[in-house]
Curated annotation (Swiss-Prot):
PANTHER family, per database record: ABC TRANSPORTER I FAMILY MEMBER 10
Domain ABC transporter: 1-233
Assembly mode: The complex is composed of two ATP-binding proteins (ModC), two transmembrane proteins (ModB) and a solute-binding protein (ModA).
The protein's name in its UniProt record: Molybdenum import ATP-binding protein ModC
Stated role: Part of the ABC transporter complex ModABC involved in molybdenum import. Responsible for energy coupling to the transport system.
Similarity-based family: Belongs to the ABC transporter superfamily. Molybdate importer (TC 3.A.1.8) family.
Keywords for the protein's UniProt record, in alphabetical order: ATP-binding, Cell inner membrane, Cell membrane, Membrane, Molybdenum, Nucleotide-binding, Translocase, Transport
GO annotation, cellular component aspect: plasma membrane
Length: 359
């Protein structure tokens, strides 16, 4: 089995959905505002809601094909589903919840109980009941239960939405380990930009039941920024040096360097950085005697003026997209136009620490 392929049309009551995308592996984030159709699409993949036509497959394993009359029931789809709430059996210990999944999976195990427990850091919880666990612990157990059913695909439906910020930060590293070590394709539903920036390898944007864009996270993420103050772009690079005196890591972005305040990075690490448009300024030339360390040569590729005081300037940095949110007055004062060669100024501290990921 390999990646997920979806090409379907259907309805959930009066709500119509039309979706087509392919996900090769890792984490595919379904992103959109509330009511965009994320959970409806997930239910169609899981088999709890039937599309009207189209096809859904994981590699060469067909889950649904309207033309061929194939519509596997949920229990035959080899899918692990994690809900917004953990839905653990309250009368069972954590260990029994996990071993139940092994029994219910009906497939030959490819990963051991101990491996899954170690992966999610839940060994110390095995004898406890769900009612004694924190929200983050319950979700880790729920993910473990899904993984022990030996799925070909994991569906995570806003698994962190019921948790506060502290609990989210507690569980995110375990989801990253799941992504990097389990080798199970994951479809991750979220409307939280921070989670998508940190976890996603691919992004599928949904709006009013339709896929508006899909592709690699670095390519699609700037489209989110166009609609959100909190968005930005994703840049990937390698830690090329570390300054012990000033506690700054230098990231090689392929011909240009980027300095980042100490975040526990080590030399040769592959990392992903998130740069918000609101933290990018523009200069006509490299300024002298300036405290900002990250100066990137860029080309203006577009200017979008809103009705308010702000404008969004689209930039190209060595084939990668950047954005800057400026006032319209600043755009006019600088005389910016498409094709201009300018300098993007990014504060080192403006890079989202939570979005740093080791590849």
């Amino acid at each position: 089995m390999s990646g997920l392929t979806v090409s379907i049309r259907g309805r959930n009551g009066a709500f119509a959905i039309e979706a087509g995308f392919a996900a090769e592996g890792g984490v595919t984030a379904l992103f959109g505002h509330s009511g965009a159709g994320k959970t409806t699409l997930l239910k169609m993949i899981a088999g709890t809601l039937r599309p009207e036509n189209g096809r859904i497959a994981v590699g060469d394993f067909t889950l649904f094909d309207a033309q061929k009359g194939i519509n596997l029931p949920p229990e035959k789809r080899c899918i692990g589903y994690v809900f917004q709430d953990a839905r653990l059996f309250a009368y069972m210990s954590v260990k029994r919840n996990l071993t139940y999944a092994r029994w219910a999976g009906h497939r030959q195990a490819t990963r051991s109980f101990d491996e899954v427990v170690a992966l999610l850091g839940i060994g110390h919880l095995l004898d406890r009941r769900p009612s004694t666990l924190s929200g983050g612990e319950r979700q880790r157990v729920a993910i473990g239960r899904a993984l022990l059913s030996d799925p070909a695909l994991l569906l995570l439906d806003e698994p962190l939405s019921s948790l506060d910020h502290a609990r989210r930060q507690e569980i995110l590293p375990f989801i990253e380990r799941l992504r990097d070590e389990s080798h199970v394709p994951i479809v991750y539903v979220s409307h939280e930009i921070d989670e998508v920036a940190r976890l996603a390898d691919q992004i599928v944007l949904l709006s009013a039941g339709r896929v508006t864009a899909s592709g690699a996270a670095a390519d699609i993420f700037p489209l989110i920024d166009a609609e959100s103050e909190g968005g930005g772009v994703l840049l990937e690079g390698i830690v090329s040096a570390y300054d012990e005196r000033y506690k700054l890591a230098e990231i090689d972005l392929g011909g240009a360097s980027f300095q980042l305040s100490d975040a526990g990075l080590k030399q040769t690490m592959h990392v992903r950085l998130r740069v918000r448009a609101r933290d990018v300024s523009i200069a006509r030339k490299i300024p002298e005697a300036i405290s900002i360390r990250n100066l990137l040569p860029v080309t203006v590729t577009g200017i979008e003026r809103g009705e308010g005081p702000n404008a969004h300037v689209f930039l190209d940095f060595r084939g990668r997209r950047l954005g800057a949110r400026l006032t319209r007055r600043s755009v006019d004062d600088l005389g910016l136009s498409v094709g201009d060669q300018v300098v993007a100024l990014v504060k080192a501290v403006s890079v989202d620490r939570a979005a740093i990921r080791e590849k």
